[in-house]
């Protein structure tokens, strides 16, 4: 690889680190091209990506972006999964790793916090951001409907009492 190609590759990885608050570092040794393509396609549906990286270049990019904590994770045949939404990407990568023993999760970074492989597996168990938003809206709407029911109850009870009294007379 020429020096100019290396600098372009480092710049590309630096952009990934800067634009994606979540990165999962994996070893992909033994995956077929079709398996890697399948993983890339499923990640693309979550607006995420998967890139095979050269360890020395990934380390240089990590040092340039202040991610010095992850440098030691780059050893062996390494690829990174990256996304702006960490939970959806973690779910896809963890599920793919369960189905394909040749993909090993090494660690990662979410919002500049270094995670080990166990933390990434726990992250994958969390609900997606859109699911959380839906639950919050649901929780906010529930008290309003209960208050409305309580406010309507006395008036409907009063109407029934008046109706009963009117039917007696």
UniProtKB/Swiss-Prot annotation:
InterPro entries: Ribosomal_uL10, Ribosomal_uL10-like_sf, Ribosomal_uL10_bac, Ribosomal_uL10_bac_type, Ribosomal_uL10_CS_bac. GO terms for biological process: translation. Keywords: Ribonucleoprotein, Ribosomal protein, RNA-binding, rRNA-binding. Signal peptide: none annotated. Disulfide bonds: none annotated. One of its GO terms (molecular function) is large ribosomal subunit rRNA binding. PROSITE patterns: RIBOSOMAL_L10. It holds the Pfam family Ribosomal_L10. CDD domains: Ribosomal_L10. One of its GO terms (cellular component) is large ribosomal subunit. Part of the ribosomal stalk of the 50S ribosomal subunit. The N-terminus interacts with L11 and the large rRNA to form the base of the stalk. The C-terminus forms an elongated spine to which L12 dimers bind in a sequential fashion forming a multimeric L10(L12)X complex. Belongs to the universal ribosomal protein uL10 family. Forms part of the ribosomal stalk, playing a central role in the interaction of the ribosome with GTP-bound translation factors. PANTHER family: 39S RIBOSOMAL PROTEIN L10, MITOCHONDRIAL (PTHR11560). This is Large ribosomal subunit protein uL10. It comes from Rickettsia canadensis (strain McKiel).
């Amino acid at each position: 690889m020429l020096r100019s190609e290396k600098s372009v590759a480092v710049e590309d990885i630096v952009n990934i680190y800067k634009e994606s608050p979540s990165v999962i570092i994996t070893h992909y040794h033994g995956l077929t091209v079709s398996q890697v393509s399948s993983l890339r396609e499923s990640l693309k549906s979550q607006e995420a990506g998967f890139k095979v990286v050269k360890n020395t270049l990934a380390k240089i990019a990590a040092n340039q972006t202040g991610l010095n904590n992850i440098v030691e994770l780059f050893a062996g045949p390494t690829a990174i999964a990256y996304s702006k939404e960490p939970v959806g990407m973690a779910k896809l990568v963890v599920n793919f790793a369960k189905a394909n023993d040749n993909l090993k999760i090494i660690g990662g970074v979410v919002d500049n916090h270094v995670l080990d492989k166990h933390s990434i597996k726990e992250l994958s168990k969390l609900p997606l951001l859109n699911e959380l938003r839906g639950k919050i809206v649901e929780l906010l709407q529930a008290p309003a409907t209960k208050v409305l029911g309580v406010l309507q109850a006395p008036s409907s009870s009063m109407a029934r009492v008046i109706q009963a009294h009117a039917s007696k007379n």
